[in-house]
Design a protein with these regions (language model features):
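Conserved alpha/beta-domain cores
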Residues: 1-122, 127-129, 137
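C-terminal helical cap(s) of enzyme catalytic domains, especially alpha/beta-barrels
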Residues: 2-6, 132-155
Length: 155
């Protein structure tokens, strides 16, 4: 229904992707911003070949090396990016969500360096609270749901 009403819109997956939902994700989304493990990359590669449809892909980098967050740690990023290219994944860029109590621009800068040395132009970084800094650092995609729709109600 969304596609029928908004046929010119691009739909991006910005949340975690479970391996068992890969088929639906490739069918539904124009971009996937959370490639965070080799098993997922391998399944996406097979599904893209099967469907003949290739959403843009962003690899999630855990620049803060936070245990509670998904993503590839910076020291393993170059190898993971290479692995994804060898799977013929259409990697557009990298994505980061900085640690909440740290200066986001440091993490945006690190993401930009990793992207640059791997020939990637897409930078998915910045949320409602820090998107200005992300844009200043070269973000190509930002997530501003709270700024548009208001804060979430967790009650």
């Amino acid at each position: 229904m969304f596609r029928e009403n908004f046929s010119n819109s691009k739909v991006h997956l910005i949340g975690p992707l479970q391996s068992n939902k890969v088929k639906q994700a490739v069918e539904l989304f124009d971009a996937i911003h959370t490639i965070d493990r080799l098993k997922l990359a391998q399944k996406l590669s097979k599904e893209i070949q099967s469907q003949g449809k290739a959403p843009e892909m962003f690899i999630q980098i855990n620049t803060g090396e936070e245990k509670q967050k998904s993503g590839i740690i910076p020291s393993e990023a170059d190898q993971f990016i290479s692995d994804c290219f060898s799977l013929d994944l259409p990697i557009k860029g990298l994505m980061v969500i900085p640690p909440i109590n740290e200066e986001p621009s440091l993490h945006f800068g690190l993401l930009k360096k990793i992207a640059h040395r791997n020939g990637l132009t897409g930078l998915s970084m910045g949320m409602s609270s820090d998107f200005e800094s992300a844009i200043a650092m070269g973000a190509t995609h930002i997530r501003v749901g709270s700024a548009i729709f208001g804060e979430r109600d967790y009650s």
